[in-house]
Amino acid sequence: MTKREQSLATPYLQFDRTQWAALRDSVPLTLTEEEIVKLKGINEDLSLDEVAQIYLPLSRLLNFYISSNLRRQAVLEQFLGTDGQRIPYVIGIAGSVAVGKSTTARLLQALLSRWPEHRSVELITTDGFLHPNKVLNERGLMKKKGFPESYDMHNLVKFVSEVKSGADYVTAPVYSHLIYDVVPDGNKVIKQPDILILEGLNVLQSGMDYPHDPHHVFVSDFVDFSIYVDAPEDLLQSWYINRFLKFRQGAFSNPDSYFHNYAKLPETEAIKIATQLWNEINGLNLKQNILPTRERASLIMTKSANHAVESVRLRK
């Protein structure tokens, strides 16, 4: 098969780092180095170059899509003879644990909110829609946290549906990584944002991923543009273990931390436990439930060492 035939056979346009960076055009970088430091995750090296070469072109693309969507809404309103109701544009960000979804989400929130249109951009993680630990324990699902059956899908779909319906305000539960649980009465209020970024393991999942659940509407049905942050599994495992070790020196030392008993472990023992957690939970979830959703994404960002994006695939 020739390169042209291969290109025609795939639903994606492929860009290497240099080709993608060229699509920035003249979009200015509105974030300072200090602001970028605050946005990055505990385990990531994030440079101004990475933001300029990868995330500015992405924010430019999203701005085009969002503007196009607003024009489409205006056409529909004109056809129906209705007054304009503000319908948020929903961006979904999926990928493995430790791949850097949260950093990508925070960066896009910062960049999109600084476009000349001064749009309001809200960010919600699907972690808040995990069942509380009490429920997971009762159902024997604590070792399946992050798997499809560990989520309150009814409430997650209800939340996204209400946002997409233009509700004046919608509440979302909040998750704490410190206590490793949903925060009781810790709701976050969303008030008709222009853009909602929804970040989580499961935003691309559909009915095929929930055979145990009879409902027929899924988060992915409400997502306007989806991003899958990808990386080879050996890198993901390495990043997960390194993140675990950094938490062991930091967050785990807090007496309120769910993982406080890991704080004083020797490094060799901590690595052993992190590897076990990866193999039995996170790596398994990646193979069974997360990776199979990758090809449903509008855009796939593939990372190499140091969390640097080396290629981008954009759905035609």
Curated annotation (Swiss-Prot):
Location (main, coarse): cytoplasm
Family: Belongs to the prokaryotic pantothenate kinase family.
TM region positions: none
Catalytic activity: (R)-pantothenate + ATP = (R)-4'-phosphopantothenate + ADP + H(+)
Signal peptide positions (record): none
Gene Ontology CC: one annotated term: cytoplasm
PANTHER family: URIDINE KINASE
GO biological-process terms attached to the record: coenzyme A biosynthetic process
Superkingdom classification of source: Bacteria
Database matches in Pfam families: PRK
Ligand binding (ATP): 95-102
Cell location: Cytoplasm
Entry's EC annotation: 2.7.1.33
Protein name: Pantothenate kinase
Gene Ontology molecular functions: ATP binding; pantothenate kinase activity
Organism for this UniProt entry: Yersinia pestis
Principal EC category: transferase
Key words, A-Z: ATP-binding, Coenzyme A biosynthesis, Cytoplasm, Kinase, Nucleotide-binding, Transferase
InterPro entries (alphabetical): P-loop_NTPase (IPR027417), PanK (IPR004566), PRK/URK (IPR006083)
Lineage: Bacteria, Pseudomonadati, Pseudomonadota, Gammaproteobacteria, Enterobacterales
Pathway of action: Cofactor biosynthesis; coenzyme A biosynthesis; CoA from (R)-pantothenate: step 1/5
Gene3D superfamilies: P-loop containing nucleotide triphosphate hydrolases (3.40.50.300)
